[in-house]
């Protein structure tokens, strides 16, 4: 009886909601890993775009309450259908293709991520956003010419230390979540490129 009573008290106290939310997330992560990572990516990507809009409003000292609702929706679509699933499978592939016991595994994984995955993923981001915004191929080409290299260089600066930690120290099942949390600010940066 005592353990059950103390458990009830613990759940009823401060922090019960975060504990239950975490337990639910871990359950969904175990039962539906790709769907859970997709949903998390969609939500956090949308939140990143919303954050970018709020930062932009503050920077311009705008007092209007209007926001571009389409921005967070586009980012949610991108996060749900692309970021979550692709990241899940990329990390899984990388873990099995370059196992920890391979010499210099951490460095090899980082190089694979930074030199192959990051440029391809960034190009995909520009392509999908161009499509979701209803723009044509010439707009995509202009975005690639004007925004790809600056964004990739910034990606390498910002994400290289984060990905080193993520790839080498974060458990495989949490890597997408770790990247999503860091990406809140990255998506805010990418969204600012679209202005």
Curated annotation (Swiss-Prot):
The keyword Transmembrane applies. It comes from the Eukaryota. One of its GO terms (cellular component) is membrane. Residues 1-30, 97-114 are cytoplasmic. It is a multi-pass membrane protein. Interacts with PEX19 and SIVA1. This is Peroxisomal membrane protein 2. It comes from Homo sapiens.
């Amino acid at each position: 009886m005592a353990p059950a009573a103390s458990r009830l008290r613990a759940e009823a106290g401060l922090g019960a909601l975060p504990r239950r939310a975490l337990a639910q997330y871990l359950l969904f992560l175990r039962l539906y890993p790709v769907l859970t990572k997709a949903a998390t990516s969609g939500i956090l990507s949308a939140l990143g775009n919303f954050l970018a809009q709020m930062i932009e409003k503050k920077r311009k000292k705008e007092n209007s309450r209007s926001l571009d609702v389409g921005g967070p929706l586009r980012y949610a679509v991108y996060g749900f259908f692309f970021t979550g699933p692709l990241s899940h499978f990329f990390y899984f592939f990388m873990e099995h293709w370059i196992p920890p016991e391979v010499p210099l595994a951490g460095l090899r994984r980082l190089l694979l991520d930074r030199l192959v995955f990051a440029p391809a993923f960034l190009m995909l981001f520009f392509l999908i956003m161009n499509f979701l915004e209803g723009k044509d191929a010439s707009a995509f080409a202009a975005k690639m010419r004007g925004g790809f290299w600056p964004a990739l260089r910034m990606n390498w600066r910002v994400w290289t230390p984060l990905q080193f930690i993520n790839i080498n120290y974060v458990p495989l099942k949490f890597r997408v979540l770790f990247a999503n949390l860091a990406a809140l600010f990255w998506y805010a940066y990418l969204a600012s490129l679209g202005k």
